[in-house]
Amino acid sequence: MSATTKTKRWISPEEYLEMELHSEVRHEYFAGEIFPMGSETVAMAGASVEHNRIAGNIFSELHAHLRGKRCEAFMNDMKTHIHDQGDDWFYYPDVMVNCNPAGQQKYFCETPSVIVEVLSPATEATDRREKRLAYEMIPALHTYILVAQDRREITIFRRAPERWLREELPDDGEVLRVPELDFSLSLDVIYARTGL
């Protein structure tokens, strides 16, 4: 008995975008391959109530703060596109801010300046490693924020001239600040209605 191997077909970014328009399950794209978001269970079942509340709290405050300004906040159905050395990635951040209208397409953004990911057990490792490294390739990005959903803890990566700086906000009295947007948000508001 011989083992059979499946050959994965390379999918172009254009094919992926067209497939995603008609898919019942959201997928992320990496260099010609597509992957269900987090896992098939997460992609089909969706995120937890806490995840949605946290992302919604952050989005609603950003959206209100940016009203009438050149920057705009988007929620989890808007993809971000990364292109580097001939490879393409498409991810669905939980929240992102774009300040460059030229980088905004109908279904994705190429120039986010802020990206927020709310961590879940199924996605935390990917958000902390793979996505962080990919997002750091976006020239316009200056702030990448990771928000725990099971404890009051926020990790912020900020672009500095030669590297990225990491900052932790583990305390109740802390405030998340994004100076480039003249925006600040307390952990109490971020974690409102979560019981944390």
Residue ranges and their predicted role:
Residues 1-196:
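Gly/Pro/Ser/Thr-rich low-complexity, intrinsically disordered segments predominantly at protein N-termini
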